[in-house]
Regions:
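Juxtamembrane transition segments at transmembrane-helix termini in multipass membrane proteins
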Residues: 2-12, 21, 58-73, 110-122, ...
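Hydrophobic alpha-helical transmembrane segments in multi-pass membrane proteins
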Residues: 36-59, 86-103, 138-161, 198-227, ...
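Hydrophobic transmembrane alpha-helix segments characteristic of membrane transport
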Residues: 104-134
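Interfacial loop/helix-cap signal at membrane boundaries in integral membrane proteins
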Residues: 70-87
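Polar helix-capping/helix-linker motif
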Residues: 31, 83-84, 245
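Short acidic/polar alpha-helix capping motifs at helix-coil junctions
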Residues: 73-78, 92, 132-133, 235-237
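Interfacial aromatic "cap" segments that immediately flank transmembrane helices
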Residues: 11-46, 126-151, 163-211, 248
Length: 292
């Protein structure tokens, strides 16, 4: 069987087959994924870098102020909290912006996966910036609604796993609304919980291990800034060069940009897990017809 047939979407696969097909597509079409998504991935990286730099520099001040007030005065002054309210609001807004930017960037990837599901191939994007607005919007809506639905299920985390299948099904089938997809697809996803668990567990493990390496420079600078700021607040000299803050920001941009592409197997393997479940459903329906 040639490689193109091996990475077709709707084909019954074991969890190993899903991971293998996902990795083949990830490697063979990486240039296409990169060309289609680099702009949105860069926007996400810039927002994430701003968040990382802000938290490394400003959040220690808030923590130390609260700790000192609790120790000395057995209470927290409202005035001190109000003075840092702007920082907290900025962090919250940056987190929301990062989530939205990531969802929009995912939309560019799902647009290519949608093309692959229909044609069995992914064409090279004609330009460096040619986004699919409809797919971006659908992905943003789907990921935000999935996040909303998954919050109550975090108490019983295993029940949240089929939502990944529901999300991919919703994005790949534009004719169906999210809530209708959730009603019809959640039970089917639960029926394949074991294979979904293995696919996502191994994929997340790969991302965690790779991400530790990719994000290591940013994490080192984050901790260095954090400890330096904590030291200043208790009377120590800063001991950091003046270029440390811009260097931290630039490092976060580069690491976040690379980390976005490290995380792509999560989307691609989920895409193939969805295709395998759909293929099994069609196979079961065909068997039922043959028995009649």
């Amino acid at each position: 069987m040639d490689q193109k047939n091996n990475i077709l979407l709707q084909k019954v696969r074991s969890y190993r087959g899903v991971l293998s097909a996902g990795m083949q597509l990830y490697i063979s079409a990486f240039r296409r994924f990169f060309k289609a998504s680099w702009m949105t991935a860069l926007i996400y990286a810039l927002i994430n870098a701003a968040l990382g730099t802000l938290t490394a520099i400003k959040v220690p001040e808030l923590i130390v102020v609260i700790q000192l007030q609790l120790q000395r005065f057995n209470g927290i002054f409202i005035e001190s909290l109000q003075s840092y309210l702007v920082v907290l609001v900025e962090c919250i807004l940056l987190i929301l912006a990062a989530v939205i930017a990531m969802a929009v960037a995912h939309g560019t990837i799902y647009a290519l996966l949608k093309e692959h599901s229909e044609t069995g191939d992914i064409s090279m994007p004609g330009s460096w910036w040619k986004p699919s607005r409809s797919m971006m919007g659908r992905t943003l809506k789907g990921e935000l609604l999935t996040l909303l639905v998954s919050i109550p299920l975090l108490i019983v985390a295993p029940f949240a796993l089929p939502l990944w299948y529901v999300l991919t099904k919703y994005i790949m089938e534009p004719s169906t609304g999210y809530w209708a997809t959730l009603r019809k697809g959640y039970g089917r996803g639960m029926g394949h919980w074991g294979s979904l668990f293995l696919v996502y567990f191994l994929t997340v493990l790969f991302i965690l291990l790779s991400g530790m390496i990719v994000m290591l420079p940013a994490n080192i600078l984050f901790l260095a800034n954090y400890r330096a700021q904590m030291g200043v607040l208790i009377g120590d000299p800063l001991g950091m060069p003046s270029y440390m803050i811009p260097m931290t920001f630039i490092t976060f941009v580069l690491c976040s940009f690379l980390y976005f592409y490290v995380c792509l197997p999560l989307l691609i393997n989920g895409y193939y897990a969805y295709g395998s479940i759909e293929a099994k459903k069609l196979e079961h329906e065909q068997q039922q017809l043959n028995l009649q």
